[in-house]
Amino acid sequence: MTQNADEYANFKVIRSYVNSIFDWAEELEYIETNHLSKTISRIKATKKIKLQESKKDEDIYLSQEELQAWFTAFEKDLETEKILSKDYVLFYTTFFLGDRKSESYALQWKHINTKEQEIKLVQALDKYKNPKSTKGNKKTTFRIPNELTDLLQEWKKQQKIELAKFNIIQTPEQYVFTYIDTKGNVNSCLHADYLNNKMKSVKRRHPELAHATPHKLRHTGATLAKKAGVSLEAISEALTHSDTITTKIYVNTSNVIPMAVGEIAFRNFKK
């Protein structure tokens, strides 16, 4: 099995199959008990680990220059009406918070206090657009900068006008980001790939941009924050990780978070 771990990137699947066979044998009473279970579980997926370690930095996060280019591209597309204000604000929000896109999708106006400049992350959306707990069931309050506060205030006003056209009243329960889906349903929650698709469309119009995804933005904020001298513990807290071990994967080199990792990165390339 150890040799297989060195040869196959999908070793976890193989390990699971082998364990299932012995569990089944135990169930059918061919063996007294599955003595191999703990032994097998201790064999690490070394091939997969090596592949992850061999990934180039540019495949994992954006440099400051590349990130700046993405912001510029979004600004240009907004000015030329190639994207909607909602899409621009969604991109900004997801980067600044350094959150999971499903958590941005699940934001409701009751979670945003522009007066106190705070956003509470308390839920996410599953692939069926239903609310679920955040990863680890964490509830986190982020302090947000003036730039994001202003964008959210403007978008809230605009959304209220747009919803009124369909006789929908904007309430605190209203989701911050919604759209008209392919079936014509108005005020529908965003589907899982919504932000990915918007970023792809921006990339098509600006082919010079480095490849990026919402998850890569999360890696970028964490890595640039680390390069700016922020401690691993502070980044771990801002990313709502349960420990710094998970955070090390990201940085590659109700908690209240005073400055999200995205803002730290943003401040540095604005200097």
What are these regions (language model features)?
Residues 75-84, 160-168, 172, 182-189, ...:
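Short, basic (Lys/Arg/His-rich) helix/loop patches that form interaction surfaces
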Residues 19-22, 26, 254-258:
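C-terminal flanking helix
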Residues 4, 8-16, 27, 31, ...:
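Basic, Lys/Arg- and aromatic-enriched nucleic-acid-binding interface segment
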Residues 41-45, 107-157, 161:
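Conserved tyrosine-mediated DNA breakage-rejoining catalytic core shared by Y-recombinases
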Residues 125, 239-264:
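Catalytic-site neighborhood detector that most strongly recognizes the C-terminal catalytic loop/helix
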Residues 60, 130-154, 171-199:
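C-terminal catalytic core of Y-nucleophile DNA break-rejoin enzymes
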